[in-house]
């Protein structure tokens, strides 16, 4: 008897819940679009170019010097003394190795800084999305890249977020 009373009360309770009460308020946002258009991204690109400019110039100079020595070896190698040719070849091998190591280190540090700055911007965008969602009482916010289809009832908050991100 208690079981039937419980079931009956649950059925009555469920039927009294309106469909509006059961619906979640859902929004979508295009994170990649916001990231690509953010003014912070443009500032970071310029900042990183400035930060790595001297090292990039140094690498370009090293590469140019290597190319000049290679041309000298190719052009004059046949007429050089064996000792001179051998010393030039050793010098080239040594300079190539130094250049290769510096270029690899440069690429790794540049990539690391780009990743660090990208993550800062994405975290800031995520915070803005969270604030907009809370302010406008959204239950769920989904990135448009994760959605294959959405109806017109789903609100796109990309512009609201974009305005706050700048």
UniProtKB/Swiss-Prot annotation:
Pfam families: OmpH. The keyword Lipid metabolism does not apply. One of its GO terms (cellular component) is periplasmic space. It comes from the Bacteria. Residues 102-113 are annotated as: Lipopolysaccharide binding. It is found in: Periplasm. Keywords: Chaperone, Periplasm, Signal. The keyword Cell division does not apply. Residues 1-22 form the signal peptide. Its main location: periplasm. Coiled coil: none annotated. Disulfide bonds: none annotated. One of its GO terms (molecular function) is unfolded protein binding. GO terms for biological process: chaperone-mediated protein folding; protein stabilization. Belongs to the Skp family. Molecular chaperone that interacts specifically with outer membrane proteins, thus maintaining the solubility of early folding intermediates during passage through the periplasm. Homotrimer. This is Chaperone protein Skp. It comes from Blochmanniella pennsylvanica (strain BPEN). The lineage of its organism: Bacteria, Pseudomonadati, Pseudomonadota, Gammaproteobacteria, Enterobacterales. The gene is skp.
């Amino acid at each position: 008897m208690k079981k039937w009373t419980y079931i009956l009360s649950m059925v009555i309770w469920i039927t009294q819940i309106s469909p509006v009460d059961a619906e979640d308020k859902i929004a979508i946002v295009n994170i990649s679009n916001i990231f690509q258009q953010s003014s912070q991204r443009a500032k970071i690109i310029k900042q990183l170019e400035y930060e790595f400019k001297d090292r990039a110039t140094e690498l370009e100079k090293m590469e140019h010097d290597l190319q000049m020595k290679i041309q000298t070896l190719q052009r004059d190698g046949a007429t050089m003394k064996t000792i001179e040719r051998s010393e030039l070849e050793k010098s080239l091998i040594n300079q190539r190795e130094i250049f290769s190591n510096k270029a690899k280190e440069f690429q790794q540090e540049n990539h690391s800084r780009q990743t660090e700055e990208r993550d800062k911007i994405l975290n800031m965008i995520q915070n803005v999305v969270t604030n907009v969602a809370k302010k406008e009482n959204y239950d769920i916010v989904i990135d448009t890249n994760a959605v294959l289809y959405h109806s017109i009832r789903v609100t796109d908050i990309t512009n609201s977020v974009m305005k706050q991100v700048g």
